[in-house]
């Protein structure tokens, strides 16, 4: 059976709403980023799907109902097709999905992404924000390969990001 985990997709898309709070955190981390370092990092808090088809992501974005606490976000995820992602952090669901036309790719919780760009845009004459991401599978693979201690605690800035996004217990110092 062909493996569902892959590395041959170049660009993936997602249309969804996000909270103003999360959007403002992304802007903050992007503005504080140090060039050359993966500093504006966000993690998936739960399972997360993207699609290989931009039009499908736009359709989902158009279906989103928002209120004063949310904005519409159109994510463009760059996958480096030259990397062997052997951590199995994502799967191509198209061949096993009940809805294969959606061309879904599933990312597992704690998949890491670097925020590359945030900008205002319009889809179907409706305001939204484009959020360009880079998948950090290579970064995670290197962390995993270099890990010497199972209980490694990230540096303070990285730890603060994890805390702020609710991905690290507040009791960890």
Feature map (PLM): residue ranges:
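Mono-ADP-ribosyltransferase
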Residues: 1-173
